[in-house]
Amino acid sequence: MPSDDGTAMALVFSVVKRAAARKRIYAVRARKLGRRAEARLLEALGASEEAQARRLFNNLRGRIDLSENFLATIFDEELAEVLAGYESQLESARATGNSALVSVLTQLRKAEARLSSFYDRQRGRVAVADDEHYFVCPFCGYLATGKAPERCPVCGAAGESIREVAGDF
């Protein structure tokens, strides 16, 4: 879990990222109202805040494992950290009675937990075919293989919203 400094930086990052997204929405609104100068300014403000958020994120990202054991780092440490974060926030949401947040975090935790199934710990490598096709639900992050499901098994999103991850590796 992040240190106190990391937690503070994560909070600032989320505030700046949210502000940038809102500026873009306000820019669209200004454009629809025919207020082009305001729309351009709001786009520029949003771009500035995006740059700020990117810099904060680069600090938050932390050290990247450049060793040959990077898969173990991902599957044994980083996934566990994300799951622990979801669990902690789930407890908090349950304690405050925030059922909407409980639902969202439960879905995200399920999607994240599935990711560990792609790693063969015995062999220390991913357990997928070289030509595997991957599909991600844009709402909960569920990762499907082979073909897109008709409905996301985690959040119920329609299959046509689930997109293939294209990569030319």
Describe these PLM feature segments:
Residues M1-F169:
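Non-heme di-metal
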